[in-house]
A protein has these predicted regions:
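Bacterial signal peptide processing site
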Residues: 25-28
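N-terminal segment of the mature soluble domain
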Residues: 37-84
Length: 166
């Protein structure tokens, strides 16, 4: 009897917690739904092969968008105005060799629909640091590439969240 009562209290507490989280707009990371006006969004960039451009296209598809083949058929266009990565040395050893690097992924974008600017140019960036060991050069280059992809994914998610509020 006592055990049944404890299970009921636990279930009600869990239901209350989930209800309050849902009520405040919380949702698990994943698909951010786009409004109908953004379902046909075209991405335009000087280089569509960058980590960010690829991540943004994937994020749009995950959010339910169906990017058209050209921007004339699009309801809106995301212009990637800047997409670059800067690497700088954070610390050096006693032998004046790099011990740690910091990479910053910078993106500038805007959104328009026809002649109407929906979102003025926005600058967003992500920064990560990693240790460097020249005896493990290939592994560290791979680590940097993974960090760049992760930052591009994070930045693309931030753009999608902004698009979902338009």
């Amino acid at each position: 009897m006592k055990r049944l009562w404890l299970n009921a209290v636990a279930a009600l507490s869990l239901a209350g917690a989930l209800g309050s989280l849902t009520g405040c707009g919380f949702h698990l990371e994943g698909r951010t739904p786009l409004p109908e006006s953004m379902k046909s969004t075209f991405v335009q960039a000087t280089d569509m092969q960058t980590d960010f451009a690829q991540s943004l296209r994937k994020a749009l598809l995950t959010s339910g968008a169906r990017p058209p083949p050209d921007k004339r058929a699009a309801s809106s266009v995301v212009y990637i105005l800047r997409d670059d990565v800067v690497r700088r040395t954070l610390s050096v050893s006693a032998q004046n060799k790099p011990n740690e690097y910091e990479i910053t992924y910078n993106v500038r974008f805007s959104v328009s629909s026809g002649d109407k600017e929906l979102l003025a140019p926005q600058d967003i960036s992500a920064t990560r640091s990693y240790s460097f060991d020249e005896t493990r050069l290939l592994a560290k280059e791979h680590e940097e590439a993974i960090l760049r992809q992760a930052m591009a994914h994070d930045l693309a998610d931030r753009v999608i969240r902004q698009l979902s509020s338009l």
